[in-house]
Swiss-Prot record:
This is Protein YceI. It holds the Pfam family YceI. InterPro entries: Lipid/polyisoprenoid-bd_YceI, TTHA0802/YceI-like_sf, UPF0312/YceI. Transmembrane segments: none annotated. Keywords: Periplasm, Signal. It is found in: Periplasm. Residues 1-22 form the signal peptide.
Length: 191
């Protein structure tokens, strides 16, 4: 009896230890469970919201060792959508994103640190031909098995960037110098 109990305990510990190791995930863009959104103030009176409809990425998540976490995302900047065709054309122009010259933006994490129940994800954001460090505050929404026999993990992250830091010089007024980033992703664990 003692041997059976010892074996069961050992097996449980092995399973628990195995579930705490880093896992690689692909962002689920096919299932439309991921969003790269932004907002900026309009004249200081309201918020203008937008999204990038085409992006892809991966992340590594280790709940016990955040320093092992990694994030890599590529965004097709021509996919910007603010629900206004003429404004979207202007955002794609050299006044803003210059998508003809820089059709992609990328984010590659350089460090991840646990801060209470959040993760501070610092990385290099390349946008409009400029690379600058940006920190996103991320929170694990949930993780576990999905109905199709796989595993998933979901996060929401927020951050801010200054337009001038990324060579966007169009003056939108004093209330519109920063853009809020609001990112929600669900990843499918890779085998």
């Amino acid at each position: 009896m003692k041997k059976s109990l010892l074996g069961l305990t050992f097996a449980s510990l092995m399973f628990s230890a195995g579930s705490a190791v880093a896992a690689d995930y692909k962002i689920d863009k096919e299932g439309q469970h991921a969003f790269v959104n932004f907002r900026i103030q309009h004249l200081g009176y309201s918020w203008l919201y937008g999204t990038f409809k085409d992006f892809d990425g991966t992340f590594t998540f280790d709940e016990k060792n955040p320093a092992a976490d990694k994030v890599n995302v590529t965004i097709n900047t021509t996919s910007v959508d603010t629900n206004h065709t003429e404004r979207d054309k202007h955002l794609r122009s050299a006044d803003f994103l210059n998508t003809a010259k820089y059709p992609q933006a990328t984010f590659t994490s350089t460090s991840v640190k646990k801060d209470g129940d959040e993760l501070d994800i610092t990385g290099d954001l390349t946008l409009n031909g400029v690379t600058k460090p940006v920190t996103l505050e991320a929170k694990l929404i949930g993780q576990g098995d999905d109905p199709w026999g796989g595993k998933r993990a979901g996060f929401e992250a927020e951050g801010k960037i200054k337009l001038k830091d990324f060579n966007i010089k169009t003056d939108l007024g004093p209330a519109s110098q920063e853009v809020d980033l609001i990112i929600s992703v669900e990843g499918v664990q890779q085998k």
